[in-house]
UniProtKB/Swiss-Prot annotation:
GO terms for biological process: cobalamin biosynthetic process. Forms an energy-coupling factor (ECF) transporter complex composed of an ATP-binding protein (A component, CbiO), a transmembrane protein (T component, CbiQ) and 2 possible substrate-capture proteins (S components, CbiM and CbiN) of unknown stoichimetry. The keyword Acyltransferase does not apply. Part of the energy-coupling factor (ECF) transporter complex CbiMNOQ involved in cobalt import. Residues 1-28 form the signal peptide. It is found in: Cell membrane. The chain crosses the membrane at residues 37-57, 71-91, 103-123, 135-155, 166-186, 206-226. GO terms for molecular function: cobalt ion transmembrane transporter activity. This is Cobalt transport protein CbiM. HAMAP family: CbiM (MF_01462). InterPro entries: CbiM, CbiM/NikMN. It is a multi-pass membrane protein. It comes from the Bacteria.
Length: 244
């Protein structure tokens, strides 16, 4: 596991950089503090809790199998933090960003991401004013649950169709990113339906707005996730093989 430590300084520099340089309020994929009505904020939190519990159980088992998994879990969490802190301006006056959940999804499965994702979202809400505490459940459902689950299904399907590993990882990361934004669009569209056209029209409008910047971001995230996974596999082949 000593080889893994070479990644830590770069990850820490990224975390420190985004913590110090992005303290402003964000209007990105993360639904901002106070934006959702209380009943919806509570609803999404209640829906998210079972996934969080299952994720904690899964992580406990992984650590019981091998304590060195802690470092890989931390690396995946840091990868999520750094990528999801990269805010890219959008034509809407908002901004978009990668999610970073594909790496952990491929390595540990989607349940683990529910824990890593909510930890990242909590830190971003407290340190970067990115997202919020009251909207934590809604943001966690989109980025830490539904996105990773969609990505995982796509990854497994791609492997079953004999796609090579890199292509499968790329598709996982890309679809997890897009699924996150589509879920956020649904969450917002349900709460804020179009006065004239209704809920579905509102959802489609949010999706169209996000797609302008999110599709190229998702493609870039897929490529970066492949590079990161291959880098870890090259330095820790036995460890990665064990996780499979």
């Amino acid at each position: 596991m000593k080889k893994l430590w070479k990644f830590i300084p770069f990850v820490l520099m990224g975390v420190i950089y985004f913590t110090l340089t992005n303290p402003e309020s964000a209007h990105a994929m993360h639904i901002m503090e106070g934006f959702l009505p209380v009943k919806w904020a509570v609803f999404w939190l209640i829906v998210f809790i079972p996934f969080l519990v299952l994720g904690l159980i899964r992580i406990r088992k992984l650590i019981a199998i091998d304590k060195n998994n802690k470092l890989l879990l931390a690396l995946c969490a840091a990868f999520i933090f750094v990528l999801s802190a990269l805010k890219i301006p959008s034509v809407t006056g908002s901004c978009s960003h990668p999610t970073g959940v594909g790496l952990a999804t491929v390595m540990f499965g989607p349940l683990v991401v529910s824990v890593l994702g909510v930890i990242v979202l909590l830190f971003q809400a407290l340190l970067l004013a990115h997202g919020g505490i009251t909207t934590l459940g809604a943001n966690a459902m989109s980025m830490a649950v539904i996105g990773p689950m969609v990505g995982f299904v796509v990854y497994k399907l791609a492997r079953k169709l004999n796609c090579n590993k890199s292509v499968s990882i790329f598709l996982c990361a890309m679809t997890a990113d897009l699924a996150t934004y589509f879920t956020t669009s649904v969450q917002l569209g349900v709460v804020f339906p179009d006065p004239a056209s209704g809920m579905m029209a509102s959802i489609l409008k949010f999706m169209a707005i996000f797609c302008v910047t999110q599709v190229p971001i998702a493609i870039a995230e897929g490529l970066l996730t492949v590079v990161m996974y291959n880098l870890i596999s090259k330095n820790l082949p036995e460890k990665v093989a064990q996780l499979r």
